[in-house]
Amino acid sequence: MENQASLNSIQKTVWDGKLPLQITLASSESRTFDQTDPYLISCPRISYLPSLLPRLRSFFASSLIEPKSQPHEGWFSFEGVPLKWHLPIGLLYDLYAGADPASKGSRPDESEQIISSVGDTLPWRLTLHFSDWPDEELVRLDADGMVMHDAFINSVKEADFLRNGTAKGIMSLSKEDSSGLWEAVQDVDLPSFQRISNILLPAPNQPFRNVPIRFFLPLPPDSGSPSLKVVQSPLPPSIPASTANATQSTVLRGKPASQLQTIGSALHSLLPNLFPSRRTPVLAKPVLHGAAVPMSAPVEEVARSAAYGDGWVYIVVRMMG
């Protein structure tokens, strides 16, 4: 496993990541004839859209047809698609608008195309609504923020159970630490987050039971299925060794040889048609925090350094070509 300093450096880079947003009030809810001025903000990738609602409600207050609307009644859409408020902003962008991520192997002409494509999608243009809540697609929020808080903590519990085989860690947290974990994500306070999350993580010399990873596969609008398909399965950090990858193999006393589970081996196991090779992206590539993930990256190292605030690694599978 990489040394802890390297993993901490990656985690800091992830938490420093931001995304420019341009948020416009839905024209059907604006009292002005022309479109209202948009709200521009650089938002942390690990944060959640509902955290913006109080300031957006104040910003658009003079333009609202319904002046009694409350911040928690707000919801967001992108190109007519309601956005899941329980997913981090960075993940939502990677799912719906992210351009093809640059990689070290890109040729100069390819890099220019990538930069041009990114420029077309940034700032990310979202529409804000305060009426006609899409009940079939989104759970309603509440004025006290408890719906959002509970959704986050439940996700933390799921990740904790997969890592340790039990959720005793999160269940035994004090009320102060439980609330503090969510507040640290909202405030993008990495030191406070690390202090609490380190209570939940197995020690560096203790492997995870399973690694909490979800793979998202965007589907075409005319597929007749939901717009997103999520693939998830228990992924242990090590797997039986193959003769083709003996360099990563370790032989434990009285146990069969094993090797590190990588992003490539996990994708090949779960999605063999899209990832026929464990080592090289052929038809699709894994994207995390807007960047292509090396197929050789061990899944546990990815989880320790680049998970979102709820402990989950959310990887978007993007088709190539």
Swiss-Prot record:
GO terms for biological process: autophagy of mitochondrion; cellular response to nitrogen starvation; piecemeal microautophagy of the nucleus; protein transport. One of its GO terms (molecular function) is Atg8-family ligase activity. It is a peripheral membrane protein. Keywords: Autophagy, Isopeptide bond, Membrane, Protein transport, Transport, Ubl conjugation. GO terms for cellular component: Atg12-Atg5-Atg16 complex; autophagosome; mitochondria-associated endoplasmic reticulum membrane contact site; phagophore; phagophore assembly site membrane. Conjugated to atg12; which is essential for autophagy. Its main location: membrane. Coiled coil: none annotated. There is a cross-link at residue 157 (Glycyl lysine isopeptide (Lys-Gly) (interchain with G-Cter in atg12)). It is found in: Preautophagosomal structure membrane. Conjugated with atg12. Involved in cytoplasm to vacuole transport (Cvt) and autophagic vesicle formation. Autophagy is essential for maintenance of amino acid levels and protein synthesis under nitrogen starvation. Required for selective autophagic degradation of the nucleus (nucleophagy). Also required for mitophagy, which eliminates defective or superfluous mitochondria in order to fulfill cellular energy requirements and prevent excess ROS production. Belongs to the ATG5 family. This is Autophagy protein 5. It comes from Aspergillus clavatus (strain ATCC 1007 / CBS 513.65 / DSM 816 / NCTC 3887 / NRRL 1 / QM 1276 / 107).
